[in-house]
Amino acid sequence: MTKCTGCKTCVVACKDAHNLEVGRNFRKVIEMQTGGWRQDRATGAWHQDVEAYYVPISCNHCADPACVKVCPTKAHHKRDTDGLFVIDTKKCVGSGLCAKACLYGVPVLNPATRKMSKCDACADRLDHGLQPICVESCPQRAIEFGPIDELRKKYGDRATIAPLPDADLTKPSLVIRPPKGLEA
């Protein structure tokens, strides 16, 4: 996050790699603004504490995923090989319960198949020793992917920042480096 400029190259690369139609995205970049302007009553001068930052987000492959708990057919499941959460489209009935349960708004309906779909961290690329397309495409190198223990050792364990929900709710496999001034 300290590096993300909001260019959305990761979003476009993901859409292209997964051949997603208009309106369906597996990634998003949320723009956040905080602070405001205030007038000094004594001098009339205006002062600001405005800050803006971008939050690139997709499926966080949570340790306690709400989407998996509500899936009526168990189509949402964890891969044994690497712990990624994926959707088995043969089992999915497109109920949309996973989308309603996900605090990050990740699962989306594929209108052509009437099945749910979401970021799978480019599992096919990972299986061939490659990084997810969002990681490779980011011109600022703001996105990293790897074993969560290694990322936490490198960057710390913070996983909550506005506008994201409290990390204690689903325990996302996510590490956030907040912009200066928002570290606390």
What is each residue range found by the language model?
Residues 1-184:
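Non-ligating segments of multi-cofactor redox enzymes
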